Design a protein with these regions (language model features):
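A short hydrophobic beta-strand element
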Residues: 111-123, 138
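Boundary at the C-terminal end of the N-terminal hydrophobic targeting segment
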Residues: 25-27
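Bacterial N-terminal signal peptides
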Residues: 11-22
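Short helix-adjacent coil turns
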Residues: 45, 52-53
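Bacterial N-terminal signal peptides that target proteins for export
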Residues: 2-12
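A short, structured loop/turn motif at beta-sheet edges
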Residues: 106-114, 144-151
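A solvent-exposed, acidic/Ser-Thr-rich amphipathic alpha-helical stretch
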Residues: 32-39, 54-109, 118, 132-135
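Short beta-strand edge/turn micro-motifs at domain boundaries
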Residues: 137-165
Length: 166
């Protein structure tokens, strides 16, 4: 029993030693203004998709962004990868009809932030005169980077939806 307690104290001490330099180097904690701006990025994400504003969506992401699509699909790197995944040339017209993004937690330091939460999206696709609808509820994780102008942009975006249980 004493051995387990001793190892537990060692593990806590090692964790603190490893984390403290990373926390110190991070530039402090998020300010209330940072958190408000990060929330606004997520609101604009909803708004731009619902308006069908592809340029508005692109503007929310860094040039070197990484999209991590669901189900282990390959990562899409940079604005080029974002365009290939979400806005491929010649793809059938797709309209987002519902998008609700609900951040559950926001954390980070003065330069990098993370946000995780839930989302619900619905869309229609029209091809050969036929319109089909689809939707899902899921989860997301975003990493954001503070820009030189003080605004925040999404650098990494990961999302998934529940797996059907049989």
């Amino acid at each position: 029993m004493k051995i387990h307690k001793a190892w537990g104290k060692v593990a806590v001490a090692m964790s603190l030693l490893l984390l403290c330099p990373a926390i110190k180097a991070g530039g402090g904690s998020l300010t209330a203004e940072d958190i408000a701006k990060i929330r606004r990025v997520h609101s604009r994400y909803e708004e731009t998709w619902l308006k069908g504003d592809a340029d508005g969506v692109r503007a929310l992401f860094t040039e070197d962004c990484v999209l991590l699509p669901p189900h282990g699909d390959k990562p899409r790197i940079g604005q080029k990868g974002l365009n290939e995944y979400w806005f491929p040339p010649g793809a059938p017209p797709t309209k987002i009809t519902k998008l609700v993004v609900v951040p559950q937690s926001i954390g980070g330091d003065g330069e990098t932030a993370y946000v995780w939460g839930t989302d619900e999206v619905a869309w229609t696709t029209t091809q050969d005169g036929k319109t089909t609808s689809a939707s899902h509820k899921g989860i997301f994780l975003n990493v954001l980077k503070k820009q030189a102008d003080g605004e925040w942009k999404i650098s990494h975006h990961m999302w998934d939806e529940p797996v059907e249980r049989h």
